[in-house]
């Protein structure tokens, strides 16, 4: 099939809409269930590229959770700790497959943003992963294949209308890509940059030591940024993105936004949060919302009289600013990638507050010396890649 008619484009008034192959060849995808829309396909094709590259770079199954053409999370399939399984709401599922662990991590990093996501999987979707997907609010999934049991499970979602796309992994797009804006066609070579160890070899700080685990995390960060709307910054720890700042005009606002998300991810692991006693009737999304408010500055919105009773069996104690800072100080060895250079050392100062120890960025600012000096002050190791990773 050379083309697929869609209900509408980005918005309901944008008709007609379709996806098609300009060269007349068949589309490299097959819709197994549902009727994906314009934005669904944008998320699916960007997400597929991301997980395909993560798998190639790490040798591990990979997953990403996309919203509005940027990843909310991305991860590889490392086993979950007991704490992570609990904060990702999968502690009742027993031991998960590596692919399911990858999606639990990708979805769990920023659960508020991942609500209603589009999922991309690097490997054939198995039953464990399908069970996890089934219980979450999601728009669809793309993968190179699905086991029979996985399809049976996904068919139970949205009364059989959940969007399930199979992509042919052998498909290789043309070297030149095009897009139109205001009737004008833009053409460029595809971004085929290989994110590898050599790209991270130019370490410009006094600290030259980047351990293997951090190198993997830096590659995850840069590959994630390659498919994130610019400007973008990505914090990674333990094989998963823990905070992604996307689409900001200011670099430091990217760093702050992603840093706050990384902080929230770590705060969810604090005893004060793990000990929250939710009402049995409260669903996962409502619990996520309650936690987000509880660990933020507006905590009274869920702790006020008449409000806490709607969410908790027992009124929680206030998680004070001092307690949160003390807990966050335990988050160490975080990696950070940036899709363009840091123009000022304020980015490094903010990154330090979220436990960053290893950094990868292109370099090339007139103030590189000040940025390096700030890294040296904190004993950070920073690599200059020499390559910008803008994505629009």
What residue spans do the PLM features occupy?
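Conserved helix-loop functional segments at active or binding sites
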Residues: 53, 227, 264-268, 353, ...
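C-terminal binding/interaction regions
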Residues: 117, 121-122, 135-165, 170-172, ...
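Flexible, glycine/charged-enriched surface loops at secondary-structure junctions
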Residues: 57-65, 164-167, 230-237, 267-278, ...
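Active-site loops and adjacent core secondary-structure elements that bind or stabilize anionic groups
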Residues: 1-199, 214-232
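Active-site-proximal loop/turn and secondary-structure-junction residues that shape catalytic pockets
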Residues: 70, 125, 237-240, 248, ...
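Substrate-contacting helices/loops that form the catalytic groove of nucleic-acid
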Residues: 175-210, 268-293
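Glycine- and Gly-Pro-enriched alpha-helical subdomains that act as flexible
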Residues: 72-112, 242-341
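Glycine-rich phosphate/pyrophosphate-binding loops
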Residues: 61-62, 67-72, 76-78, 232, ...
């Amino acid at each position: 099939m050379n083309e697929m008619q869609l209900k509408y484009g980005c918005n309901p008034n944008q008709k007609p809409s379709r996806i098609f192959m300009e060269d007349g060849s068949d589309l490299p995808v097959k819709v197994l269930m549902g009727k994906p829309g314009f934005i669904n396909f944008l998320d699916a094709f960007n997400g597929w590229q991301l997980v395909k590259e993560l798998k190639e770079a790490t040798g591990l199954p990979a997953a990403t959770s996309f919203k509005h053409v940027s990843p909310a999370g991305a991860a590889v399939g490392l086993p979950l700790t007991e704490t992570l399984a609990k904060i990702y709401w999968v502690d009742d599922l027993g031991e998960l497959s590596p692919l399911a662990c990858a999606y639990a991590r990708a979805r769990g990093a920023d659960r508020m943003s991942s609500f209603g996501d589009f999922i991309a999987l690097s490997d054939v979707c198995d039953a464990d992963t399908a069970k996890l997907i089934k219980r979450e609010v999601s728009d669809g999934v793309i993968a190179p294949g699905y086991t029979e049991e996985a399809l049976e499970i996904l068919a139970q979602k949205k009364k059989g209308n959940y969007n399930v796309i199979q992509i042919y992994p052998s498909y290789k797009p043309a070297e030149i890509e095009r897009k139109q804006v205001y009737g004008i066609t833009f053409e460029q070579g595809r971004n085929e940059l290989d994110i590898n160890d050599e790209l991270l070899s130019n370490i410009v700080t006094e600290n030259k030591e980047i351990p293997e685990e951090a190198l993997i995390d830096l590659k995850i960060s840069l590959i994630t940024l390659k498919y994130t709307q610019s400007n973008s910054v990505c914090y990674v720890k333990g094989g998963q993105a823990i905070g992604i700042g996307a689409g900001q005009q200011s670099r430091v606002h990217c760093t702050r936004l992603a840093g706050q998300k990384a902080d929230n991810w770590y705060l969810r692991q604090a005893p004060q949060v793990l000990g929250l006693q939710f009402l049995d009737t409260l669903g996962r999304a409502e619990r996520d919302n309650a936690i987000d408010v509880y660990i933020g500055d507006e905590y009274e919105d869920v702790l006020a009289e008449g409000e806490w009773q709607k969410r908790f069996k027992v009124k929680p104690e206030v998680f004070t600013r001092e307690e949160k800072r003390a807990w966050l100080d335990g988050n160490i060895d975080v990696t950070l990638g940036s899709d363009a250079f840091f123009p000022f050392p304020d980015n490094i100062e903010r990154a330090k507050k979220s436990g960053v120890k290893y950094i990868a960025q292109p370099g090339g600012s007139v103030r590189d010396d000040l940025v390096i000096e700030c890294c040296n002050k904190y004993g950070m190791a920073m690599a200059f890649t020499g390559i910008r990773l803008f994505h629009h």
